[in-house]
Each structure stands twice: as C-alpha cells, then as structure tokens.
Amino acid sequence: MRRGLQVELINLNDIVLKYFFTPRDKYLPFEEVWQDALRAKIEEFQPDFIGISCMFTMTHQSLARVTDLSRQISRRPVCIGGVHVTNDVKRVMEDVPADMAFIYEGDLSFLRFIEVVEGKRPASELSQVVIRDDGELLRFDNRLVPSPDDISLMPAFELVADLSAYTQHGSIGAFSQFKREKARLATVLANRGCRAQCTFCSVRTFNGVGVRGKAIGVVVDEIAYLKEHYEIEHIMWLDDDLFYDERHTIHLFNELTRRNLGVTWDASNGVIAAACKEEVLAAAAASGCTGLIIGMESGNPKILREVKKPGTVKHFMRAAELLRRHPQIYSCVFLMLGFPGETLSMMYDTLNVAREMDLDWYKIAILQPLPSTPIYDQMVAEGLIEDVGFLEVRLELGAFGKQNELYRQPLLASRSFKEIFANLDPNAVPSRRDVDNIWVYMDYHLNYHRLFSLTDSIKIQLQKRMLENIYNVTSAGHPLALYFRGYFARLENDPVLAEILYERLKKSLDSSEYWRDKFPAFNVSPQHLRDNVFPNFKVPRIRAGSLPVDELLVGC
C-alpha cells in the first residue's frame, strides 16, 4: 500500500504450469484450472478494480477469455493493458469486453486515473487511457512518460506468490539452459526504451523516444534482494537496449562484479552491435554474462538503411570479432527474411555476413509486421498486406518459433536445395514458399552443419546444451538437433546415448512428413548415428562471400 492502494496479483500462467507439473492421479481440464483460481482470488479479495495485462499478440484469446470471466464474476470495472493492447487498442477493445484500456507505460497514467476517480483532478487530465462509454471509445492520448527517477524503484516482490519457485515450472529467455544446474531465475530491467528506430519494432511505439535508465544502485540492490530473499542465481535482462550509454553500462557491470553476488545473467532481447565495445564485453563477461544476442536482421546495406537499423555490416563484423574473444559467452544473432523488396541476392548477403561472423547460433525469423510499426504502415500503403491488425499476426515466439510453424506447413516440394536456388532469379523477390526453403537452408548451414567443424571444448559443451534444450524444450523432438547431438555422442565415444538419440530421431521422423522430406535433401539419416558414419562431415562449410548455388552442396 505504498500509495494507499491495496493491491494483489495473480499469475494465471504460473498457476497453470504449477498444476500440470505436479504429479496427481487425475488432472482437471486446462480451462477449469485457471478459471477456478481466478474466481477464488476475485471472490476472496473483492477488488474495486480488476486489471489484466497482456504482452503477446499470440495470447489475445486468453486475454479475451480472462476478461470475460472477470466480468462474469465481478461487477467491478475491468481494464486491460500491455504491449499487445497498446499496439492495436481499437481492434482489441472491439473484441475484448473490457471497460477501459491503459496504453503505453502505465506507471503515471494509472495513478492519474485514480486521482481523477477520487476527484482530485478533472477528467480532462486523464492520460493514456481508452474508456468504453455507451458503445463508444473515448481516447485520452496525453502522454505521461515516467522519468528515470520514477522508474528507479524496487519492484513490490512481496506481491508475487512464491517467486523462488517460478523456475521449477517452465523457463524464460534464450539462455536458461546455460545457467548453473538448478539455479533459480528471475528477470530484471535496467533501462526502458531503445535508441534505435527499427521500422519493424514496436518498442518505440510503447516506450516512446529514447532510453531512460534506472539508477545503478537501485538495479544492483534489486538483484542483491532477489539473491538474498529468493535465492535467485541467474537473471535475464528485459532491456531492449542494455548497452545504452557505454560508461553507465560498464559501471553497472563493474558494480555487479564488485558486489560479488554470485549471479549470472543473459541478454535475451538483443543488444546493438555498435555498442559492443571491448571494454563493455569484458565487463559483461567478468560480471557473469552467459549469453547475448546481437540484433543484425540483415546483411544487406540497402535493407539496413531502409529499416533504420543502428548498425552497419562493419559494426556486425567488429562485434563478432570481439565476442569471439569471450568463448564463455554464448553469442547469437537475430536474422530476418522477407522485408519489402528484399531480393534473393539480398538474402544471400545476410547469409554471407552471418557466416563470416562465425558466432554460436543464428535465430532466423520471417518478417511478421506488427500493427503500429512503420513497416506495417508501409506494407499496407504498398498493398503488400491488408490492414487487419493483430487478427493476422502469428508471432514466432521464442528462439525456435519459426521452426515450429514450418513443421505444421503443407509439405514443400521434395527438391534439392541446389535445384531450388538454381531456378531462382537472384534479383527477384522470392515467393513466400521459396523464402521458407531459404529459411530452412540457412538454418541448417548456419546452425547445424557448422557443428561438424567444431573443435573448441568449451563451445562443444555449450552447443550440446543448446541442442538438448531445442529437442527437449523449445522444439520438442527436433530432428536436426537430435541428429547432431547424436554426432557429438559418437564423437565422445558414447554409443549408448547415440542409440537413445537414434530411437528418438526415428520416432520424430515417423511423425513428421515435413522432416521425412527434408532429411534426404540435407543428406542426413538416423542410420548415421548407428553406423557412426557422417557423410556430411567432409562437406565444406559455406564460405563467406559466396552464394549457395556456387557451393559444393553434396546432397543439399
């Protein structure tokens, strides 16, 4: 009750995960689990006001169902908010039976709303809220952006039920597999906003222009509090621009090192390549960094300019060179295909730059324009997409969302990749079907085939963890991950594990027509794990600076 308001939280996601992770003789249906929990909380607390937050478009239907049930249980006003709501608030309000929606950051605007309700301010001073009134939507757009002082507060962790147990049920981020075994994980935010203006990103829409940093002492005290009270040993930074302000960043990491908290961390949301200076990365490594992602998206200079990326190919190469000096940091790169007007040769540029960077993993996505972003408006204006808002958005959530989506697609034509590329015009924009093939080719060669040439013992151990996380967690039964983990098992003279992986791989292929089609195209087979013979071992990696059609693509 810091401001005289009594607040209680309920995390429906954690309740559902905890329920189904707990062994029991009989399980209730999914819907009953969260509905019973929500009903019990509302009836016990009897709130004057119910707020529901939704970050991801893919959970829109959950937002709608939770809102609807809340209205059935209580006659009190129900409001919604979060990134998803902000990005397309009019359409969301048309589909979700909420009384109002708070848009953008609600730290100050919600308190302003309370003051208006209490009669301390006139209604004309309402900010960042959309109110349903007799079938109409009244929108108050005045922006109240929290200052660095406003956000330099310790979160009210006491409102979160059993924070220390969260890691037992599910995972978060791209690098949880690299934390110490059984280490508990939490999230922390040091900065809000991003200096970049990437046209495909909604961060600037939500947070506004620029970056606001929390006081370093407050951030480190928060991490120390999590360690002391909840035994948290790994944090994932939620920042969209963690390396903003070089001196501030180095000071933050040095303070973490000085305090010797014994906490590791990762940056799953990506960092700006131009900000990856040696002193920053050295301080990051010393303070416990286990993994980070560079936001590259494209290796073509024209595309980079058009989407307003804050970096050049030179920046990407330099950042990769510096990261290779810190092998304990698992370094990934965000790549994206399918930008407006992006030709096949431009996609080759991305492939070639990524290959030359030679980092640990490449998270490849196909562009999905989000409402309220410049690229969405551009594509609508050019007739490339229809203005249907979130209704057609299919977020590729997590590091392997694209893979999971492809596996559900109709079977692609069974052709070798050499044939596919030979029949494409390098100066033409590929069809969506061809982009899918290009994606699969890039994923195999940038992430998997290169493992044949890996010799560094530190990197081999990290890649084994990555592969295990893929086929056990992020993309269950992923055939390529199983195949290459089997290769490492054979490399380490572990035929028992190789046989186990062989059986799992056979089962995965039996259930996936898609992968039964693609495995021969890559010249890989489960039998290789049994025979300890891997024909592609002798196939050279893609050379930087050359097009795939020019490569020695034996079986590919």
Can you annotate each of these PLM segments?
Residues 1-222, 227-231, 463, 485, ...:
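Acidic, low-complexity intrinsically disordered segments
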Residues 9-11, 80, 267, 333, ...:
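A structural preference for short, hydrophobic beta-strand core positions in alpha/beta folds
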Residues 13, 84, 240-245, 270, ...:
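Short, solvent-exposed turn/loop segments enriched in Gly/Ser/Thr/Pro and often Arg
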Residues 18, 130-133, 137-144, 330, ...:
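C-terminal accessory regions of radical SAM enzymes
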Residues 157-337, 343-346, 352:
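Radical SAM [4Fe-4S] cluster-binding motif and immediate context
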